Amino acid sequence: MGSIKIAPSVLSADMANLKGELDKIAGADYVHFDVMDGHFTGNLTFGVDILRAVKRSTDVPVDAHLMVTNPDETVDWYADAGADMITVHYEASTHLHRTLTHLQQRGVKAGVVLNPATPVCVLESIIDVVDMVLLMSVNPGLAARALSRAPSQSFTSSRPCASATACRP
């Protein structure tokens, strides 16, 4: 099984001091870049222009976490902007296997995100094209929500699945 990676989110960063905020996390494995479209979640956050600014300001690889409706149609925007990894929600993707394969063919690591209520067994048919799995501890949307118990249960049940195919974070 892959190792645990540290990926601080820029969602709570001081955007007026983005470079300084990114300098503080220079030793992280990834910068976690939350993208919310106001449809899949009730909130609206960053687009590709901010991702480009992040990429210009740090050497830390960027994981674009797409909390959007129809991520299959938008992954190329974030790949073109320089995302090193793109994670899409299982619950939002119509053609998940195709989207993950497409990302990998472009040289972008492909991740899948599961909401707290989604069973981990849904990964069985796509695990061969998954570089990373993110188990949400809260329902997607706003920051500072109460932690859900579901992810710890999902993590325990995901171990056999992840062990069957080596994950590549």
What are these regions (language model features)?
Residues 109-113, 117:
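Internal catalytic-core helix/loop-beta-alpha segment
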Residues 138-140:
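Short glycine-rich anion-binding loops that position phosphate/pyrophosphate groups of nucleotides
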Residues 120:
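Short loop/turn elements that flank and shape the SAM/SAH-binding pocket of Class I
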Residues 143-147:
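Glycine/threonine-rich flexible loop motifs
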